[in-house]
Amino acid sequence: MSEIQDYNSSVSDPSSRKFETFSYLPELGVEKIRKQVEYIVSKGWNPAVEHTEPENAFDHYWYMWKLPMFGETDVDAILAEAEACHKAHPSHHVRLIGYDNYAQSQGTAMVIFRGPISAKC
């Protein structure tokens, strides 16, 4: 049996913080984010955008940007809403969520824009 590798993290170390899906991978580029939105749409999930201050990123509740985009299938419209949220709140983390109506839960959630991370977080 192999040993379990410990994940060294610290709330006081900004470079060690991880956020949800894909946070252990290199940062997603524009095309990869587009692919994730296409996946959300292909699954029939309802996209939504949320944001919060970096110091509150580990709280359970983030601010919802408008309402979830029920039935939206236009990838460009979804990306435009995420970009609008980022422009309105440039110092906040912005995450994209895909709500699964059937399972009545989040199908996916990922931080797509990160606000500046300071040691006080």
UniProtKB/Swiss-Prot annotation:
Molecular function via GO: ribulose-bisphosphate carboxylase activity
Cross-referenced InterPro entries: RuBisCO_ssu, RuBisCO_ssu_dom, RuBisCO_ssu_sf
CDD domains: RuBisCO_small (cd03527)
Superkingdom, natural source: Bacteria
Gene3D superfamilies: Ribulose bisphosphate carboxylase, small subunit
Keyword Ion transport: no
An individual GO BP term: reductive pentose-phosphate cycle
Pfam family, one: RuBisCO_small
Miscellaneous note of the record: The basic functional RuBisCO is composed of a large chain homodimer in a 'head-to-tail' conformation. In form I RuBisCO this homodimer is arranged in a barrel-like tetramer with the small subunits forming a tetrameric 'cap' on each end of the 'barrel'.
Family in the record: Belongs to the RuBisCO small chain family.
Assembly and oligomerization: Heterohexadecamer of 8 large and 8 small subunits.
Function (record text): RuBisCO catalyzes two reactions: the carboxylation of D-ribulose 1,5-bisphosphate, the primary event in carbon dioxide fixation, as well as the oxidative fragmentation of the pentose substrate. Both reactions occur simultaneously and in competition at the same active site. Although the small subunit is not catalytic it is essential for maximal activity.
Protein name as annotated: Ribulose bisphosphate carboxylase small subunit
Protein's organism: Alvinoconcha hessleri symbiotic bacterium
Gene expressing this chain: cbbS
